[in-house]
UniProtKB/Swiss-Prot annotation:
One of its GO terms (biological process) is maturation of SSU-rRNA from tricistronic rRNA transcript (SSU-rRNA, 5.8S rRNA, LSU-rRNA). This is Putative ribosome biogenesis protein slx9-like. Belongs to the SLX9 family. It holds the Pfam family SLX9. Transmembrane segments: none annotated. Keywords: Nucleus, Ribosome biogenesis.
Amino acid sequence: MPKETKETKKYKVEDEFAKAEKTSFVHIPSIKLDTSTLANNFKSLNKNIIPSGKLDYDNDNNENNNNNNENKHIDKRPQLISKKDKRKQKKEAFLQKFNPSLKLQKKKQQDDDESNDGLGMGGVLSSIDLLKDSMKLQPKTKGPKLTNEKRKKMSLKEANQYKNVLSHPSFKANPFATLQEHLANSVALQNQKIKQEQDFKPNNNNNNRNKLKRK
């Protein structure tokens, strides 16, 4: 068997590399890179496109992290109200119902709405509200029980009144103004009755006291 020399070993290495370049699946091409063409192309690029200086990515990331941390610390749960504050709110709401200054402001606002309203609906609504308030203040008393005949008479009477109102010339000319005047008059009558009843009660109490003293 012949001995292997340095030359035979060299040929074997070359053959192995030659075999590695060609496989049964892929042929690996040999590419030569021309550095001069790359350098020329790089010089021809527009320098304005390439950003100058360092981009400060770290500061942006730090700002975003700080904002996220601040949002995490914000408590989005509904705040609980103590019993003392609840009682205070209820008391204020109760006092506002009986505050005369608030009623005057409400009436003034309604008057302004009436002046702005072409049809005069604001005045009608304000007089309706006043009538409701006076009806609430009036003490409730149980009236006599109505029979069927009395109910029929009342319904006929109301139907006739309704027809008379519709046929009235002032109602035909300006129905909203007529309703407003009627409601204002009814409110004045209700207030007058309430005042008379309140004045009548102290007089009765004084008379009863005088009678007891005489006895």
